Amino acid sequence: MAAGLRKRGQPASVGQPAGIWKQWLQRAWQERYLLLREPRYTLLVASCLCIAEVGITFWVIHRVAYTEIDWKAYMAQVEGFINGTYDYTQLQGDTGPLVYPAGFLYIFTGLFYATDRGTDIPMAQNIFAVLYLVTLVLVFLIYHQTSKVPPFVFFFMCCASYRVHSIFVLRLFNDPVAMALLFLSINLFLAQCWSWGCCCFSLAVSVKMNVLLFAPGLLFLLLTQFGFRGALPKLAICAALQVVLGLPFLLENPIGYLSRSFDLGRQFLFQWTVNWRFLPETIFLHRAFHLALLAAHLSLLLLFALCRWHRTGESILALLKDPSKRKVPPQALTPNQIVSILFTSNFIGICFSRSLHYQFYVWYFHTLPYLLWAMPARWLTHLLRLLVLGLIELSWNTYPSTSFSSAALHLCHAVVLLQLWLSPESFPKSIQPSRKTH
């Protein structure tokens, strides 16, 4: 009987290892699928990508030639500041006058000394490589907290963009510095450290003014969270930091400093435009065109604020009240509300910019995966989203820009805007109780 039992059990024992291996392989394949699709794996995928980016970034530095564009001009402007020139109208570089706020000078003064008065280009590239990796970490922390974007998208946000690697480590522009500080401020907002976040936001503005495109969204969030009176101290922090940083130059020539560093009417050269190549140059330079873009920008911001960001049922003027005195009980801002409003505010500004130059790509590159994937839309499949992302990348990599590349960029922007407009409400009815903020 025992022999019979062993005989009858033998086929099962022989087939058992094969069955185990089959189950293990099936589970491994399933987990790999989930690894790329489930946002809960963001940190794991992000860690692997950051490790890969260390090699890729330093490979780019050593294999691709550095291109001088603005670095020498930055260093010349910094040297003038170090030599005691505090009149902004007298600070010049090879490419023209200094047009950035004071924070730029202080940060690049540190780079001036770290790179042997700006002459050690490899050292500067290594510093910007570290800045690139830090920026990635800050961005991944944002995506981890929102838990909306499938991790497979991050491959396209990291390794696939030659233009972004070039902006950071082959061109050494100041735009990456401003954006790194901006992403740090968003992480602070997500941690409910609103005062420190506003301080860091203002510091980012002091490096380059493009960060102000996030300001309408930030103002809306501050009013939502604190009301008018509660938001005033946060806004005062932003203003005070600008005054402190610019004080040496304001004392020397206040009009010169303000007109140079915060010149909102500065004219752009048509030869560098990425987004308006299909227009005649006369229209591109015309003041009426600029005013029309500004009107469209402000109108769309107002529409989003009224119809998409503010959906509590109260008048938008209720945001001016103390949160405890509103009809709708005060609610904590969720990570997705904070990020979606800030990213959307910036994206609307990008869409209606008077001109986008190649280095401006970093103004919104790292926000595109969120804008495309975080807002559910049945009509926009993963494949279509990747197509939009790819066309945007192609448009920014077309040099010089063409009428087709500019038109394709606007078409992609329109698709993203449409998805944002059709997305579900940013402020759902059921939100966790408000937490203590500071």
Swiss-Prot record:
Membrane topology designation: Multi-pass membrane protein
Question: What is one Gene Ontology biological process annotated in the Swiss-Prot or TrEMBL record?
Answer: protein N-linked glycosylation
Question: EC number(s) of the enzyme?
Answer: 2.4.1.258
Could you tell me the superkingdom of the organism this chain comes from?
A: Eukaryota
Pathway where this protein functions: Protein modification; protein glycosylation
Q: What does this chain do?
A: Dol-P-Man:Man(5)GlcNAc(2)-PP-Dol alpha-1,3-mannosyltransferase that operates in the biosynthetic pathway of dolichol-linked oligosaccharides, the glycan precursors employed in protein asparagine (N)-glycosylation. The assembly of dolichol-linked oligosaccharides begins on the cytosolic side of the endoplasmic reticulum membrane and finishes in its lumen. The sequential addition of sugars to dolichol pyrophosphate produces dolichol-linked oligosaccharides containing fourteen sugars, including two GlcNAcs, nine mannoses and three glucoses.
Protein name per UniProt: Dol-P-Man:Man(5)GlcNAc(2)-PP-Dol alpha-1,3-mannosyltransferase
Q: Which organism is it from?
A: Mus musculus (Mouse)
